[in-house]
Amino acid sequence: MLCLMLCVLCWSRSDVAALGSVVENEDALLRHLFQGYQKWVRPVENSNDTIKVLFGLKISQLVDVDEKNQLMTTNVWLKQEWMDHKLSWNPEEYGGITAIRVPSESLWLPDIVLFENADGRFEGSLMTKAIVKYNGVVQWMPPASYKSSCTMELTFFPFDRQNCSMKFGSWTYDGSMVDLILVDENVDTKDFFDNGEWEILNAKGMKGNRKDGLYSYPFVTYSFVLRRLPLFYTLFLIIPCLGLSFLTVLVFYLPSDEGEKLSLSTSVLVSLTVFLLVIEEIIPSSSKVIPLIGEYLLFIMIFVTLSIIVTVFVINVHHRSSATYHPMAPWVKRLFLQKLPRLLCMKGHVDRYSFSDTEEKETTLKSKLPGKQKHKQAKDGEKVVIAFLEKAADSIRYISRHVKKDAFIRQVVQDWKFVAQVLDRIFLWLFLVVSVTGSVLIFTPALQMWLNSTL
């Protein structure tokens, strides 16, 4: 047991000694490297030498795409690597140390910034430690959160695709001092955290140069092709709008004497106004492009407004009669009582304006009454009976004319009601065709574009 304890004690002392030697070697190495090191001076042997910075981008999260303010917020890692000959050493002289971690604030940095920032934070990165290798290679991969400007193309919202770019380059050094070398044209997405509203279809970088007089300034531009996942807006915006448009069609299926026709149309118009305000909160205030969903809402609002006007007209027709000084014209009788009902598959309408049977009965009644010649030949007793019959006949004719007048008025009212039904049926089919056609024409290009992007 005593021997075991002695072995453990000797082993722990050797580890402590080894650890102490590593710490001492690293401390000595840091003092050696940074003795007289000036981080404000480019680490080159000759003043005309160019530092080549290997640059790459790794995206970890697409935080937000703000359509209203036209911003894209991302969390990325900036991969940077360059040669600093002042920070090289012989590993054998420092206990085999081949790499050390050094605070980036103590090193010369290539001051690479995002040009298209939108919040004033050009650097946007955390000053993490850098890895310095024995051969002078410096590797620095700081995390950064950027808000970059992105011009939104919302024509096909919510089936849209956006192309946002991020442009990186040195803020103060031209191409003769610091040159950017694109390591990989593809953005690293291995650790990308999926966004619930957007997916990245493509993310590639491209090197470019900006000329300014005699100087050239290299930069790297990364383009992100984003596609919106439209399920949310389809369920809570497009489908309700489609439902409201077809609900407008059903207004003409209600009976013409129902006062709820106008109430339904007005309620639909108010609902569409609310949806239009929701769209206005999402899209930017620009007159260059109007989203198709906005055009569709305007189309439906005009559609509903016309339905209200037509409904008022139909209700007016429904309550017309000869008593309101609206006699029915002959062409209205032929068109709305005879021809159109057959075309619209409605039950035939009885011609209520034929009075031949009544006139024949009245003529027959008059012919059966004794004339003046018969009166002269009649006896005095018969004259009394005939006079009584004539008075009775006059009363019957008066009652008959009154009854026919009332029946005529009722028939005219029924005819105007039938005309209102025919108008309702016409506008029902007309608005249904216009609603379906308009919906298809407006949404088909957006659906085609979105489906092509998925293939």
From Swiss-Prot:
GO terms for cellular component: acetylcholine-gated channel complex; neuron projection; plasma membrane; postsynaptic membrane; synapse. Component of neuronal acetylcholine receptors (nAChRs) that function as pentameric, ligand-gated cation channels with high calcium permeability among other activities. nAChRs are excitatory neurotrasnmitter receptors formed by a collection of nAChR subunits known to mediate synaptic transmission in the nervous system and the neuromuscular junction. Each nAchR subunit confers differential attributes to channel properties, including activation, deactivation and desensitization kinetics, pH sensitivity, cation permeability, and binding to allosteric modulators. This is Neuronal acetylcholine receptor subunit beta-3. SUPFAM superfamilies: Neurotransmitter-gated ion-channel transmembrane pore, Nicotinic receptor ligand binding domain-like. It catalyses: Ca(2+)(in) = Ca(2+)(out); K(+)(in) = K(+)(out); Na(+)(in) = Na(+)(out). Neuronal AChR seems to be composed of two different type of subunits: alpha and beta. CHRNB3/beta-3 subunit is only able to form functional nAChRs when co-assembled with another beta subunit. Participates in pentameric assemblies along with CHRNA4/alpha-4 and CHRNB2/beta-2 subunits and with CHRNA6/alpha-6 as well, forming stoichiometries such as (CHRNA3:CHRNB4)2:CHRNB3, (CHRNA4:CHRNB2)2:CHRNB3 or (CHRNA6:CHRNB2)2:CHRNB3. Its main location: membrane. The keyword Repressor does not apply. The gene is CHRNB3. Keywords: Cell membrane, Disulfide bond, Glycoprotein, Ion channel, Ion transport, Ligand-gated ion channel, Membrane, Receptor, Signal, Synapse, Transmembrane, Transmembrane helix, Transport. Glycans are attached at N48, N163.
